[in-house]
Amino acid sequence: MKICAIGLRGIPDVMGGIESHCQQLYPKMVKNGADVTVIARSPYVEGKKYEYQGVKVISLWAIQHTLLETFVHTFFAILYARIFIRPDIVHLHAIGPALFSPLARLLGMKVMVTHHGADYNRQKWSPFAKKILKFGEKMAVTFANRVLVVGRTLTSALREEYPSYAEKISFVPNGMLPRFTGEISSSHLPSELELTPQHYILTVGRLVPEKGFHDLVEAFVQSNSKLKLVIVGDTDHHSAYSNTLREAATDNVIFANRRGGDELKALYQHAKAFVLPSYHEGLPIVALEAISAGCPVLLSDISPNIDIEAPKDCYFPVGNVYELSKKLSGLDELNLTLNRSDYLEKYDWESISDVTFGYVDGLKA
């Protein structure tokens, strides 16, 4: 079974939830017998052609533009796939690329779409762009042979909105990474950040408005917390928002840029708490990473975060700086206890890979 993945920036170690999803999923599918090729975007990967754990990666030119990048690259990637790769299935990631589901079908390829979240709710998009993304969702549901959705609530909503296509819409979540579970010494904390274990609050993600980091910084400043706030992440395209956010840096508000490997694992494991103040998510991989590392979490009360089913104290009203500030001030008084083993079983990448491979296999006929 030959699969061509389109819609992600690339793998491995490219910033983004979709990219993390694909980096975990496809090597496991290769072990199950799939032949997987990822068509990556040239600015985010090194080399024209290479392999990562059995997954073939081909770099195709992409314009770096907030709106045009995804659409232009997806269009040419589908044509490239049809002419040079000739896959049995095109696996499109996210509803922007899913706009081209009809094109892939017209070219004779079967299509599976993974819906990573209602991107039309993202703050950065104009009303016109939001309509295009909503239309992309409709094209996915209408023309794809199978639609996988990472959020349980979103799966139910799509089945209700498109009852005629409900049978081909399936819930398949993101997974947790077992590599974050083993204990790691605080000596792996980035030395230049001068952090003390259990004396900092952590957040991880791209510096874009829908992640809500501006709320977190404001809430932290308003709180009486004696901890530090560490923000791990960067942005693909520098913007007024990211520049303004970085201006809030102080001795206690630290922008740590991108981190990975043992550094990121140590940052999760030795944090007092992990906070995700997002306005928009699919199923937040960074929250699952924090839980797998044994770090207490505070999450905004948007549906994808509620789907994680953490204790009540773990949630705060999205956009409510005052309520978040109160929680940051009283972390020791909150019940943030999670049964990590339950989550590791529920969000196991091996099982998720098997389920995804089963849906792929079902499209062979």
Where are the regions a protein language model picked out?
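A conserved mid-protein helix/loop that constitutes part of the nucleotide-sugar donor-binding site
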Residues: 20, 199-222
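An aromatic- and histidine-rich active-site surface loop
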Residues: 69-83, 87-115
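Donor nucleotide-sugar binding/catalytic pocket of nucleotide-sugar-dependent glycosyltransferases
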Residues: 134-183, 195-198, 203
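Nucleotide-activated donor-binding/catalytic signature segment of Leloir-type glycosyltransferases, i.e.
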Residues: 242-259
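Short alpha-helical donor nucleotide-sugar binding micro-motif in glycosyltransferases
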Residues: 258-259, 266-271
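Aromatic "clamp/platform" in nucleotide-sugar-dependent glycosyltransferases that forms part
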Residues: 279
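Short hydrophobic beta-strand element within catalytic cores of glycosyltransferases
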Residues: 292, 296-299
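Conserved acidic donor-binding segment of nucleotide-sugar-dependent glycosyltransferases
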Residues: 313-322, 328-333
